[in-house]
Amino acid sequence: MPIIKIRENEPFDVALRRFKRSCEKAGILSEVRRREFYEKPTTERKRAKASAIKRHAKKMARENLKKTKFY
């Protein structure tokens, strides 16, 4: 759990913004959303594999774009 120390004479909205930023860096909200509902192990593996395939396709597209010369 991210903890922030409120500085002297620090406005509440600034402290809240720092807290939100630290929560985002820690990945708390994404973890909560991921654990909100039970996901079967097969579904989890399927989603991870689809993500890897998509990542690979994007990487290959970027590499092919680099090799193309536009002159």
UniProtKB/Swiss-Prot annotation:
GO cellular component term, pick one: ribonucleoprotein complex
A Gene Ontology BP annotation from the UniProt entry: translation
MF annotations from Gene Ontology: structural constituent of ribosome
UniProt cross-references to PROSITE patterns, sorted A to Z: RIBOSOMAL_S21
Gene3D superfamilies assigned: Ribosomal protein S8
PANTHER family: MITOCHONDRIAL 28S RIBOSOMAL PROTEIN S21 (PTHR21109), SMALL RIBOSOMAL SUBUNIT PROTEIN BS21 (PTHR21109:SF22)
Designated name of the protein: Small ribosomal subunit protein bS21
Organism of provenance: Wigglesworthia glossinidia brevipalpis
